[in-house]
């Protein structure tokens, strides 16, 4: 810019040689100066900006340039210089010092020069130079812009400016005309005047003159200041000084003279000087405060600037010098090169105790001078300096209008000393302080009072806030947790029309959660630019009264609505409508409807909000939280199903305590009051499961919880249940959400389907073929219907799973014909043993339940076993009839047991409720109803009708003990065994400690459990549910492999446990037990778990306690138990159970632990990967499984309950093999042979437990063997094949022979495969209708797979899970069903959030599997398992956890969708997925249908995340497990 350039030049010129400048300026005359005027002004502005820049250093060059430039430039330079000189104060100051010379020179040059000299004093020599030609210009300048630039500062420029363009001040010209001193005096005065007086009248006053004398110095300073221009209003200073010091004009004059000398001595204010030089240092010992409100000219003193403590004052010390000197203090700019401030001046503060000081004006800037004395150690606390805010007019005059536009409210105190050297020269030291904010701090806003303290969640009410400092830009914030930035907060709308500094009117924003049931307290605070109000006012959001009823209703609706979208009345009507169904088809209607009825009844009763809630829950449970209510209902159903082996079991379970139950059921359906009574009865008589389920099938879980807790507690527990249920509901509610949608259809369809199923299944039990047909119909039609309703999602999943399991059971029932005898024998033996064991165990498990349990196991199991044999012999219908009868007995026992359990497991019941709910949730009813029902159902189906009945008894009667047992026993074990289950976790953990593998497994398992717990931790109940679920899911998974395991996590378990467990799936109790055995194994010692899984416990106990004694049972149970044993073997039962659990969870965990993920993958994936990856642990886990299978195989071979055992084992190995014992036996023979080989490889221990243990150990040690063993099972796991050729035997059959050994080995695992292929064909249905069962059943019938399928039918879900190679989709499908389980597991494993999507878990699992060592095979397996979900769930017990929760939600919600959407495709996709590698992606799209969303997401992630996540998950699991241990302990 010209001005900048000129200012530089002018400053330089000035600095360099005032004389030459002067002569040039005189040469140039006014025009040039006027020309320069604008420049000078600009310069002043520029110089202001540049002054600092061009002050000291550039002067000579600038001068040259200035010389080179014309007079105008020099004159403007003068202005610039003046402004510049400010910046280059040193030079300029010297110039001003030179001013005397300059003045002399100027005076020599001319009067103008003289006056210029005065100007130069005022301004700079350069200004003078410029101005002495431009003296008139000064007039012009002053005249032109006296006010703006007449600040001599600028006016130094100004003066120059005056000379240059500020000459407007005639006075200046006058002064110029006058003697320079006069002029300087006058101009100085005029500056003062300007400040004090209107600019026009700024002409000289007497005052000014004295000021002027000072001004001479001051003016020179001013010139400098001008250079500084904006930042030090010298006017005010002058005025102040003149006013204040006007009296001492003489003194001022003296000062002037002194300053004349002093000026010569003291450098210009804009000069830059060192802090330290020649061994002398001026330093600030105490910095001034950071904020000091400057005083205005018109107000009184604001006091001196204090230090930051407000107790003292800024302190300065001069080091290296011991002679008295004068300390100068002025106000400088806030940053950059030091120069006087344009808006603030220093002012003297006087008081009684202040240090004496004097105020001088240098270059238009007020400078406070204080003496530094050696007596004070050359240290001074500066307590006499204040800060003065200049008037805008003074600012403009001082720095020009342009400069005055740049507001700066920060300033620094500048301390300077001039030390005389011996040679007469001056050493100047200068140091600036830290910046001081010179404005009043904005008041912090404050709320003093508000007109409203609470408001409904809808908000929109007006609140009047009275307070302080509500400034522009104020915001009123409502925040939930003020200490948490991430908590909910919302800005209230302010009525700006009524906005005031002291009051505001705002509208309350709506609360984010419109469905709160309790008042929520939030904070209100005000935020302004100055910050937020220090005080946070409390404000309360209350539940919406309108919505409150609705809310309660909503809760009820949410809970019951999921069961049935209809209103409660509608639900009641529907229930009543289905009342016939309830009575007629008590199976589902009671199961399904009863919960609704209880809810509606309870609602009708409105016994208590809690009951209503419980009711809701029961509805909800029914929905998915059905899990909770359904949990017991499911238990009921399960026991019923278990008892009947079909849904008729619910009726039979209602039948069992038909008096109570039918009454209860009917009362439930029809009698709210009775319901209350019934509920009470339920509480008192948990034994009456139907009652329980009737009274609260939500309460069933509640019943467990509530009954356990008792209705009194029930309210609390209802909430707890609601809470746990909520958890379950969270788990289940997602499920419920889907199931809610799905449940009306589900209930309707499920009821219809289940009625059909119960009608079909149960009628079909009349003829096995009918069952098969019905099952096929169900699969094809019903399941399609189920799928149709399944589109509803989880409900359908549940239904599908249930139906699939029912179909399985019917198929199993029908298929078992050949196998029935064997299975019957096995069942009889097993169940007898189980009964015995259960009797033995159940006492342990259910000490109070013992009689019931004994009765049940003895009566039910033996009776059942006996009746089962005849029944299986006679037919399913006989079996079912007997089962029903037994179930009735069982249910009565179960009711007793339940009561016992409830009493025993009140706490456990809560846990279990939660467990079950979460399991139910996880199973999404799939697991619970499906798991238990299906598990019992499936397991019984898996076992055979006999087994089923047996299992039903196991499950039914043990479910009363088993289903119940799982539920009750589980509950009790939750309490005791349940605790055991969780203790299984816990114990398992404890026992785990026994063996690291065990620990790992247990920890993994528990971690899984706990992860599940954590994942499902929402309620630990869920945890437990989850754990239980896990156990259940995993165990149940195991069950549900047979059952719904595949449905969810169980699939994984299915694969792992499932195969084995499912192999022993006919001994589904065993399966269940294996779960429990796993749990049992974990809690194995805790024989309660035996009770828990009475059959399995016996198995576990048998295996653990009597490995061989219960060989028949062991075979069955060994299959499971073997798993348990195997798992529990090395570290006996904990490991066993852990392993079993590990099979899914622990094994996964083992896998997780070892290869964490692989284990996970391997677990379901097949154990192989587990083996391969975490061979030792996995192997342990899988070995346990494999050993279980092997053990089972050996058991089969050893026990040679091989036909039965094979049936059993095959059920496990080839779940389908049970029904197709003949073929499957060969197949199984192959399977088992390979497995046997594996077993043999592993080591055939006479005692399965030993084998298991050995195998576990061996597996752990002999990973290969295990791999082989597992491979055999892992045959299931394609991993085995990739991993090991021997496993490939089985495995290859899995992969390649999928058709071959798939049928045989795969029969076990690959039956899935075959089933997968077949299932692929049928799997669409299977998938759709949980076709797994269907497919399994259908394929089973279709091929030897029919036997295999029966196997898989037995554990079709296993097939699904295991049908991984070809029908991983199936697995997915089942898995989906298991999804619930998986969901549980997932939620359990939810911590392993790596698979967020349910299905993505599947993909993840595959991905994870892919990530793992034999991931692809595993992936395949898992893909098989499509259940990757499951795998993931299980695989990533850690990772699954996330999945788990997600799974629950996802699967249950997505379950039917998954099943539905992926019917045909899923199997293929699953199969594709099951095919390691690529298929995953292929399969994913269809799987995507079910799994795709999650799968695609997860599979990439899964693989990448797989290993690390698994490891992390393992760690998580371990930590979780530890937590779980604590939890279990606490539970």
Curated annotation (Swiss-Prot):
Q: Where is the composition biased (Basic residues)?
A: 200-212
Q: Where is the composition biased (Polar residues)?
A: 41-51, 122-134, 241-260, 841-852, 869-878, 981-996, 1224-1247, 1267-1278, 1291-1304, 1331-1371, 1487-1502
Could you tell me the keywords of this UniProt record? Answer: Acetylation, Activator, ADP-ribosylation, Chromosome, Cytoplasm, DNA damage, DNA-binding, Isopeptide bond, Nucleus, Phosphoprotein, Transcription, Transcription regulation, Ubl conjugation
- Organism equals Homo sapiens
Q: What is this protein called?
A: Nuclear factor of activated T-cells 5
- Cross-link named Glycyl lysine isopeptide (Lys-Gly) (interchain with G-Cter in SUMO2), sites: 556, 603
Provide the positions where the record notes the PTM N6-acetyllysine. Answer: 122
Q: In which tissues is it expressed?
A: Widely expressed, with highest levels in skeletal muscle, brain, heart and peripheral blood leukocytes.
User: What the entry says about post-translational processing?
Assistant: Phosphorylated. Phosphorylated at Thr-135 by CDK5 in response to osmotic stress; this phosphorylation mediates its rapid nuclear localization. Poly-ADP-ribosylated by PARP1 in response to DNA damage, promoting recruitment to sites of R-loop-associated DNA damage.
